[in-house]
Structure formats: structure tokens, C-alpha cells
């Protein structure tokens, strides 16, 4: 979950690209359907994901892209491009716990870095905007939990053990004395994650229920 600190010129480049996307969305307003405009929002989380992916590729730790907070931006982008509400909601529900974990284990330990901030804060902002349009559906937490289990399994199979992506290989450092084995830690972690996703879904459903969603697009 570490991130690459861009030199001064590079944040400007990213902000410039984001401004271009925003200008294009405004230019297209009235010339394309609202559904197409809604799909194009997916360019933003895709950019957030690619910024992190380029960083990890450069430092030869590409496995870090499978952290839930990073891969979630890619899932949100795909959901928007395909106009798939379920994929959008799965990605969005993960932005809340992802933000807290990032703040506790990255910001407090290492400080604020540009691409990491884009992935977490930027992803959250886009996610909340999208959620206003589609609303949070009951039962989303179950799909989000299943998504977590799949990504954690992929992390265990395809990423290096020293990266410990999604805590798929060993106990989180500092917690070794509390658990007798990794699988005891994994079981507790899995239960905590399931409960957290359930609580986050309830919170988001109360704020943006589906029946009050402001979408003007027809989604599948």
C-alpha cells in the first residue's frame, strides 16, 4: 500500500489530465446521452489505478496493485464503463474501510503521497458521487465480501510473500503476540471484514437508498 512520491512536475500532469477529462465531459454535455457521460466518469478511477500501477511496476513490486484499495479503482472503472451497478457498488463499499486502513498504516507511518492519495481519496470522492446516482442496494456487502475472498486468494497465489498483499501470507506485523497461528489471525480478520462491510452497507443504504438515487441513466 506504499506509494511513489511524484516529482513536482508530475502531480501537475495528472491534474492537467483530470481537468481535460472534466472539460471534455462539459463539452459533450448535450451532445451525448446521459448514459455515455455517466460511463465516462470511469476514466477517473482508471487513471487513479494506472498511476499506482506505473509506480509499482517501476519499483518492481507490481503485486501491490492487488490491494483492495488499488484494485477497487479498476473495478469501479469497469463497472462504470459497463454500466454495471453491482460492480460499482462492490467497489464503492470498499472505499470506506480502505480509506481508514490507508490512513492508519500508510499516512500515519509514511506520510501523504500523491498517487496513494489519488487512489484512496480520489476513489472515495468518485465513488460517493456515483453512489448518489445509483444508491446502495441491500445485500451488496455479501458480494463485496466474496470479492475480497477472491482477491485475497489471488494475492496469496500470485504475489510475493514479503509483500503480504491483503494480509494473504502472514500476520500483520505487531499482531504476532495476539495469535497462535496465521490461520487463527485469518479467521478473526475475515469475520471482522464481513461485519465491517455489513455495517458500511447499512450506513450507505441509509444515506443513499436505491429508491432515492438520482440517476437519469438506464443501467443494467
PLM features per residue range, with description:
Residues 26-44:
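N-terminal membrane topogenic signal
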Residues 46-73:
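Hydrophobic transmembrane alpha-helices
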Residues 46-54, 95-106, 146-157:
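Aromatic-anchored segments of alpha-helical transmembrane domains
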Residues 54-62, 105-114, 134:
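Membrane-interface helix caps and helix-loop-helix hairpins in membrane proteins
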Residues 71-80, 121-132, 186-202:
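Hydrophobic cores of alpha-helical transmembrane segments in multi-pass inner/ER membrane proteins
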Residues 88-96, 116:
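Cytoplasmic-side transmembrane-helix entry/capping segments in multi-pass membrane proteins
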Residues 109-152:
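A contiguous pocket-lining binding segment that forms or flanks enzyme active sites
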Residues 160-200:
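Membrane-interface transmembrane-helix boundary segments in multi-pass integral membrane proteins
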